[in-house]
Protein backbone atom coordinates (compact mmCIF):
# COMPACT_ATOMS: atom_id res chain seq x y z
CA UNK A 1 0.00 0.00 0.00
CA UNK A 2 2.79 2.44 0.93
CA UNK A 3 4.53 1.69 -2.34
CA UNK A 4 1.33 2.39 -4.28
CA UNK A 5 0.84 5.72 -2.46
CA UNK A 6 4.47 6.63 -3.12
CA UNK A 7 4.06 5.84 -6.81
CA UNK A 8 0.85 7.87 -6.92
CA UNK A 9 2.63 10.84 -5.33
CA UNK A 10 5.38 10.61 -7.93
CA UNK A 11 2.80 10.36 -10.72
CA UNK A 12 1.03 13.42 -9.27
CA UNK A 13 4.30 15.38 -9.48
CA UNK A 14 4.71 14.16 -13.07
CA UNK A 15 1.19 15.37 -13.88
CA UNK A 16 2.10 18.80 -12.48
CA UNK A 17 5.20 18.85 -14.69
CA UNK A 18 3.34 17.92 -17.88
CA UNK A 19 0.53 20.37 -17.12
CA UNK A 20 3.06 23.16 -16.53
CA UNK A 21 4.69 22.59 -19.93
CA UNK A 22 1.37 22.39 -21.80
CA UNK A 23 -0.05 25.44 -20.01
CA UNK A 24 2.99 27.59 -20.77
CA UNK A 25 2.82 26.74 -24.47
CA UNK A 26 -0.89 27.60 -24.50
CA UNK A 27 -0.33 30.86 -22.60
CA UNK A 28 2.41 31.92 -25.01
CA UNK A 29 0.23 31.00 -28.00
CA UNK A 30 -2.57 33.16 -26.58
CA UNK A 31 -0.24 36.06 -25.88
CA UNK A 32 1.37 35.92 -29.31
CA UNK A 33 -1.90 35.13 -31.11
CA UNK A 34 -0.08 32.29 -32.84
CA UNK A 35 0.79 28.70 -31.94
CA UNK A 36 3.66 28.83 -34.43
CA UNK A 37 5.18 31.88 -32.70
CA UNK A 38 4.80 30.14 -29.35
CA UNK A 39 6.67 27.07 -30.61
CA UNK A 40 9.30 29.36 -32.13
CA UNK A 41 9.70 31.08 -28.73
CA UNK A 42 10.15 27.70 -27.01
CA UNK A 43 12.78 26.72 -29.57
CA UNK A 44 14.68 30.02 -29.41
CA UNK A 45 14.45 30.55 -25.62
CA UNK A 46 14.37 27.05 -24.04
CA UNK A 47 15.85 28.14 -20.69
CA UNK A 48 13.40 31.01 -20.27
CA UNK A 49 10.57 28.69 -21.30
CA UNK A 50 11.58 26.12 -18.67
CA UNK A 51 11.90 28.88 -16.08
CA UNK A 52 8.33 29.99 -16.82
CA UNK A 53 7.24 26.36 -16.58
CA UNK A 54 8.85 26.14 -13.13
CA UNK A 55 6.64 29.00 -11.90
CA UNK A 56 3.50 27.25 -13.15
CA UNK A 57 4.77 23.96 -11.73
CA UNK A 58 5.10 25.54 -8.28
CA UNK A 59 1.50 26.77 -8.35
CA UNK A 60 0.29 23.32 -9.44
CA UNK A 61 2.13 21.60 -6.58
CA UNK A 62 -0.28 23.31 -4.17
CA UNK A 63 -2.88 20.81 -5.37
CA UNK A 64 -0.79 17.99 -3.86
CA UNK A 65 -2.05 19.05 -0.44
CA UNK A 66 -5.62 18.44 -1.54
CA UNK A 67 -7.45 15.14 -1.46
CA UNK A 68 -9.34 16.25 -4.58
CA UNK A 69 -6.18 16.66 -6.62
CA UNK A 70 -7.86 16.60 -10.02
CA UNK A 71 -10.04 19.47 -8.83
CA UNK A 72 -6.90 21.30 -7.71
CA UNK A 73 -5.14 20.73 -11.05
CA UNK A 74 -8.17 22.00 -12.94
CA UNK A 75 -8.79 25.10 -10.81
CA UNK A 76 -5.15 26.22 -10.92
CA UNK A 77 -4.90 25.49 -14.65
CA UNK A 78 -8.18 27.32 -15.22
CA UNK A 79 -6.85 30.35 -13.32
CA UNK A 80 -3.78 30.50 -15.56
CA UNK A 81 -5.93 30.08 -18.67
CA UNK A 82 -8.23 32.92 -17.57
CA UNK A 83 -5.17 35.17 -17.23
CA UNK A 84 -3.88 34.05 -20.63
CA UNK A 85 -7.23 34.53 -22.37
CA UNK A 86 -7.60 37.95 -20.75
CA UNK A 87 -4.14 38.89 -22.02
CA UNK A 88 -5.08 37.66 -25.49
CA UNK A 89 -8.24 39.81 -25.50
CA UNK A 90 -6.47 42.86 -24.05
CA UNK A 91 -3.79 42.70 -26.75
CA UNK A 92 -6.58 42.90 -29.31
CA UNK A 93 -7.35 46.44 -28.09
CA UNK A 94 -3.97 47.80 -27.01
CA UNK A 95 -0.23 47.20 -27.25
CA UNK A 96 0.44 46.85 -23.51
CA UNK A 97 -0.07 43.28 -22.21
CA UNK A 98 -2.29 42.36 -19.27
CA UNK A 99 -0.64 42.81 -15.86
CA UNK A 100 -1.56 42.80 -12.17
CA UNK A 101 -2.22 46.56 -12.17
CA UNK A 102 -5.15 45.91 -14.52
CA UNK A 103 -6.72 43.70 -11.86
CA UNK A 104 -6.33 46.48 -9.29
CA UNK A 105 -8.15 48.79 -11.70
CA UNK A 106 -10.94 46.29 -12.41
CA UNK A 107 -13.59 48.54 -10.86
CA UNK A 108 -12.72 51.33 -13.30
CA UNK A 109 -12.64 48.85 -16.18
CA UNK A 110 -16.22 47.74 -15.51
CA UNK A 111 -17.47 51.32 -15.94
CA UNK A 112 -15.99 51.56 -19.45
CA UNK A 113 -16.44 47.97 -20.62
CA UNK A 114 -19.20 49.07 -23.01
CA UNK A 115 -16.58 51.12 -24.89
CA UNK A 116 -14.76 47.93 -25.87
CA UNK A 117 -17.54 45.32 -26.18
CA UNK A 118 -21.00 45.21 -27.69
CA UNK A 119 -23.93 44.27 -25.45
CA UNK A 120 -24.10 40.73 -26.85
CA UNK A 121 -20.39 40.27 -26.17
CA UNK A 122 -20.80 41.41 -22.55
CA UNK A 123 -23.73 39.01 -22.12
CA UNK A 124 -21.67 36.20 -23.67
CA UNK A 125 -18.75 36.87 -21.31
CA UNK A 126 -21.09 36.88 -18.31
CA UNK A 127 -22.68 33.62 -19.48
CA UNK A 128 -19.29 31.99 -19.95
CA UNK A 129 -18.20 33.07 -16.47
CA UNK A 130 -21.40 31.59 -15.04
CA UNK A 131 -20.84 28.32 -16.90
CA UNK A 132 -17.23 28.25 -15.69
CA UNK A 133 -18.32 28.78 -12.08
CA UNK A 134 -20.94 26.05 -12.39
CA UNK A 135 -18.31 23.77 -13.91
CA UNK A 136 -15.96 24.37 -10.97
CA UNK A 137 -18.72 23.49 -8.49
CA UNK A 138 -19.67 20.33 -10.40
CA UNK A 139 -16.02 19.35 -10.72
CA UNK A 140 -15.53 19.71 -6.97
CA UNK A 141 -18.51 17.46 -6.31
CA UNK A 142 -17.72 14.85 -8.95
CA UNK A 143 -13.90 14.72 -8.84
CA UNK A 144 -12.39 11.66 -7.12
CA UNK A 145 -10.88 11.90 -3.66
CA UNK A 146 -7.46 10.54 -2.73
CA UNK A 147 -7.84 8.01 0.05
CA UNK A 148 -5.24 7.11 2.63
CA UNK A 149 -2.25 9.14 3.80
CA UNK A 150 -1.26 12.04 1.52
CA UNK A 151 1.85 12.81 3.60
CA UNK A 152 1.07 16.46 4.26
CA UNK A 153 4.37 17.20 6.04
CA UNK A 154 6.49 15.66 3.29
CA UNK A 155 4.38 17.32 0.61
CA UNK A 156 4.61 20.71 2.32
CA UNK A 157 8.40 20.39 2.48
CA UNK A 158 8.42 19.55 -1.23
CA UNK A 159 6.26 22.59 -2.08
CA UNK A 160 8.43 24.92 0.02
CA UNK A 161 11.56 23.48 -1.61
CA UNK A 162 10.01 24.05 -5.04
CA UNK A 163 9.29 27.67 -4.12
CA UNK A 164 12.88 28.27 -3.03
CA UNK A 165 14.13 26.59 -6.22
CA UNK A 166 12.04 29.02 -8.29
CA UNK A 167 13.48 31.92 -6.27
CA UNK A 168 16.99 30.55 -6.85
CA UNK A 169 16.35 30.16 -10.58
CA UNK A 170 15.10 33.75 -10.65
CA UNK A 171 18.23 35.04 -8.92
CA UNK A 172 20.53 33.09 -11.23
CA UNK A 173 18.64 34.19 -14.35
CA UNK A 174 18.72 37.84 -13.25
CA UNK A 175 22.44 37.71 -12.48
CA UNK A 176 23.12 36.05 -15.83
CA UNK A 177 20.90 38.70 -17.49
CA UNK A 178 18.84 35.93 -19.05
CA UNK A 179 15.81 37.81 -17.73
CA UNK A 180 15.36 41.30 -16.32
CA UNK A 181 13.14 42.82 -13.65
CA UNK A 182 13.44 46.29 -15.16
CA UNK A 183 10.98 46.52 -18.03
CA UNK A 184 11.65 49.56 -20.21
CA UNK A 185 8.99 48.31 -22.61
CA UNK A 186 6.32 45.99 -21.21
CA UNK A 187 5.33 44.53 -24.58
CA UNK A 188 8.95 43.69 -25.42
CA UNK A 189 9.49 42.18 -21.97
CA UNK A 190 6.47 39.88 -22.32
CA UNK A 191 7.71 38.83 -25.75
CA UNK A 192 11.27 38.14 -24.55
CA UNK A 193 10.71 36.73 -21.06
CA UNK A 194 7.31 35.08 -21.34
CA UNK A 195 3.85 35.83 -19.99
CA UNK A 196 4.14 33.84 -16.75
CA UNK A 197 7.30 35.52 -15.45
CA UNK A 198 6.27 39.02 -16.53
CA UNK A 199 2.78 38.75 -15.03
CA UNK A 200 4.18 37.24 -11.82
CA UNK A 201 6.70 40.06 -11.63
CA UNK A 202 3.89 42.59 -12.02
CA UNK A 203 2.19 41.06 -8.97
CA UNK A 204 5.31 41.62 -6.86
CA UNK A 205 6.48 44.88 -8.43
CA UNK A 206 3.49 47.21 -8.81
CA UNK A 207 5.47 50.34 -9.57
CA UNK A 208 8.08 52.77 -8.33
CA UNK A 209 8.53 52.80 -4.57
CA UNK A 210 7.80 55.97 -2.60
CA UNK A 211 11.00 57.99 -1.98
CA UNK A 212 12.08 58.29 1.65
CA UNK A 213 11.86 62.09 1.52
CA UNK A 214 8.42 62.18 -0.14
CA UNK A 215 5.82 64.47 1.41
CA UNK A 216 3.07 66.83 0.32
CA UNK A 217 5.19 69.82 1.39
CA UNK A 218 8.08 68.52 -0.72
CA UNK A 219 5.84 68.25 -3.77
CA UNK A 220 4.53 71.79 -3.24
CA UNK A 221 8.10 73.02 -2.92
CA UNK A 222 9.04 71.39 -6.24
CA UNK A 223 5.92 72.83 -7.86
CA UNK A 224 6.82 76.33 -6.65
CA UNK A 225 10.34 75.91 -8.05
CA UNK A 226 8.94 74.86 -11.43
CA UNK A 227 6.45 77.73 -11.50
CA UNK A 228 9.05 80.35 -10.64
What are these regions (language model features)?
Residues 173-228:
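Soluble catalytic regions of membrane-associated enzymes that act on cell-envelope
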Residues 2-190:
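Transmembrane and membrane-interface helices of multi-pass
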Amino acid sequence: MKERLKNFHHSAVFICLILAIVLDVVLEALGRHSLFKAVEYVWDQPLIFLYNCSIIFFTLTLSLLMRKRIFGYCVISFAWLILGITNCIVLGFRITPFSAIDMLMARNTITIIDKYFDVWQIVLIAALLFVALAGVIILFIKSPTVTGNIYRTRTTVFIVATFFCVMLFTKIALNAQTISDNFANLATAYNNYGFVYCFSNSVVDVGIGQPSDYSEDKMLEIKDDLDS
